Amino acid sequence: MPKDSFPTAAEYQDAPTRYPALTLIDLSNEASAIQEQYKNIVLSQVNNSCLRMSVIEGGYPWHYHPHSDELFLVVEGSLSIELADGRVFKLGPRQSITIPANTVHRTSAATRTVNLCFEQVAAETVFIDRPPALHE
């Protein structure tokens, strides 16, 4: 997937929240409604954090979040998370991992995958071309 098909860091940070507090969210309906190869929506906010739903088929560019950890929880499919040091985590349904702030990473999915992300509402996303550790 071309890099310019993803939202800019500013667009990602400014995404509106879909559901206010005390609103029932049906994750199956939300996931079924997304037809794009990549879509990331803010479902809800809790204090200074948010719950995002991401649907991905293909790869997401290398990036990091300077001031925010990011927790991934796979709902459907299989998500690979590659770190700049070469480690790769493969998550299936109901598996989760937290990526610490300042950790360069990228996600990919060979087939349609739905995951939830928990992070700060104002989490900054910094995109990079390729991590230094992989320039060899």
PLM features per residue range, with description:
Residues 82-84, 108:
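A generic structural motif
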Residues 50, 59, 78-80, 104, ...:
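Structural motif
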Residues 101-129:
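Ligand-binding loop in jelly-roll beta-barrel domains
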Residues 85-101:
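Short acidic-glycine-tyrosine-enriched beta hairpin
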Residues 1-52, 132-136:
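A short, N-terminal "cap"/entry segment at the start of jelly-roll beta-barrel domains
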Residues 55-56, 65-82, 121:
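Short, conserved beta-strand element in jelly-roll/cupin
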Residues 47, 75-76, 92-93, 111:
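A cytosolic small-molecule/anion-sensing beta-strand core signal
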Residues 36-37, 50-66:
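Conserved short histidine dyad/triad with adjacent acidic residue
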